[in-house]
């Protein structure tokens, strides 16, 4: 039991550190007129996440998009050098998000480029909590888009909402209307636990429910 409690505390400490990383991303957006792809790359690179935050799969930004904005959004991202870009999955929905920045932009993370996380129920629930509360929210267990056919791990995502600057955010409705997107991180569970506990060979089976709420506690 003592070992379980120590593990739980270690996980909580690390998750709070990851939350602060996301808050730094929100701060970057709030301090800038425009955060470009290069700016986001430079920001995440400066964090040296592999060394300082082992276990994190990346740090990204998912843009919130209304249906009448979708085509212009796709054209803009394609003009940045991604001619095949689209928002996935295809189909008409009342609202969309799209992962437009995710660093490091390696082979795994490129698999998530353009994915609408609102299209999947578990991710949607966490994103709605983050949007409505203004706080960090963590999803339940999912299989990340980053997974390949080998070494498939359970995963989860941490979200922090980004709102328009200079608007009132006192009510849920105001927060919903001011939403611009989410700074977020995906986590692969085994990699995360190795990063926290420093154990390379052990198979980890951790209950994600301890994080599945409106805030990390």
Question: Model-predicted segments: where are they?
Answer:
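Intrinsically disordered, low-complexity polar/acidic regions
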Residues: 2-5, 30-217
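N-terminal alpha-helical signal peptides/signal-anchor transmembrane segments
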Residues: 3-33
């Amino acid at each position: 039991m003592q070992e379980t409690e120590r593990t739980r505390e270690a996980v909580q400490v690390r998750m709070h550190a990851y939350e602060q990383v996301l808050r730094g991303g929100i701060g970057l957006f709030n301090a800038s007129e425009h955060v470009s792809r290069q700016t986001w790359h430079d920001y995440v690179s400066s964090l040296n996440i592999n060394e300082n935050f082992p276990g994190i799969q990346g740090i990204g930004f998912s843009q919130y998009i209304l249906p009448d904005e979708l085509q212009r959004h796709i054209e803009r991202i394609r003009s940045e050098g991604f001619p095949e870009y689209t928002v996935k999955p295809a189909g008409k929905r009342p609202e969309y998000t799209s992962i437009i920045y995710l660093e490091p932009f390696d082979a795994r993370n490129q698999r998530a480029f353009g994915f609408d996380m609102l299209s999947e129920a578990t991710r949607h629930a966490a994103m709605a909590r983050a949007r409505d509360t203004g706080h960090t929210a963590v999803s339940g267990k999912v299989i990340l888009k980053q997974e390949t056919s080998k070494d498939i791990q359970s995963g989860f995502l941490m979200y922090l909402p980004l709102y328009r600057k200079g608007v009132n955010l006192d009510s849920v409705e105001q927060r919903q209307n001011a939403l611009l997107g989410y700074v977020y991180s995906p986590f692969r569970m085994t990699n995360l636990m190795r990063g926290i506990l420093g154990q390379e060979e052990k198979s980890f089976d951790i209950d994600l429910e301890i994080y599945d709420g409106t805030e990390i506690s």
